[in-house]
């Protein structure tokens, strides 16, 4: 990873100042959503419009990431490029979630994601996407689930299972349990 783009809305100026005061060896650019929150899909779309890259790794900041995820991430990246797919989501079995209130977003069969009434896998907040999956977007404000649902309908939504403990800062209750 040579370039990092951070999409911001809340506390954008503070985040930008913090990054500018660090001595990171990466090219880091902070992109602001401006007047309106763009939601998850719109935020990623905002980054894509401000970039020339074809493929993007996105990480949600409300997951506690650590070096234990590195091998999983490298394996997921290898699968993505080897199979020339246009998306892949890192998921974890719901029993590995620190927050036992999180029930599941998807099912995983091989590396294909699906949904039904008994979803057992939680989206971790990490995905690799190709800009082409945003070609049909005609609105700047939308949830990433809009894209996922279209891919699910075509049976083209891919997943990769992490076996790490999943810690999502769902709310203040979870934050307090971690302290």
Where are these regions (language model features)?
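Short, polar loop motifs at secondary-structure junctions
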Residues: 11-12, 92-94
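Proline-centered loop/turn at the N-terminus of a beta-strand
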Residues: 29, 55, 86, 156-158
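Catalytic-core segments of class I nucleotidyltransferases/pyrophosphorylases
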Residues: 57, 64, 69-81, 94-98, ...
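Conserved N-terminal catalytic core of the sugar/cofactor nucleotidyltransferase
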Residues: 1-60, 64, 71, 136-139, ...
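Structural beta-sheet core signal
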Residues: 6, 58, 87-90, 159
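Conserved beta-strand termini and adjacent loop/short-helix elements that scaffold enzyme active sites
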Residues: 9, 31-34, 90, 116, ...
């Amino acid at each position: 990873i040579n370039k990092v783009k951070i999409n911001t809305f809340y506390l954008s100026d503070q985040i930008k100042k913090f990054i500018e005061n660090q001595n990171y060896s990466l090219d880091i650019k902070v992109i602001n959503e401006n007047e309106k929150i763009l939601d998850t899909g719109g935020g990623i779309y905002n980054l894509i419009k401000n970039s020339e890259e074809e493929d993007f790794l996105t990480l949600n900041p409300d997951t506690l990431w650590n070096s234990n995820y590195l091998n999983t991430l490298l394996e997921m990246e290898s699968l993505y490029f080897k199979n020339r797919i246009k998306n892949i989501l890192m998921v974890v079995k719901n029993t590995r979630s620190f927050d036992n209130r999180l029930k599941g977003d998807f099912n995983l069969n091989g590396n294909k994601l699906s949904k039904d009434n008994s979803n057992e896998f939680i989206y971790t907040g990490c995905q690799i996407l190709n800009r082409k999956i945003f070609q049909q977007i005609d609105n700047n404000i939308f949830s990433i689930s809009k894209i996922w649902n279209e891919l699910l309908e075509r049976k083209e939504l891919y997943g990769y299972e992490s076996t790490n403990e999943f810690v999502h800062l769902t709310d203040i209750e979870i934050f307090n349990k971690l302290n």
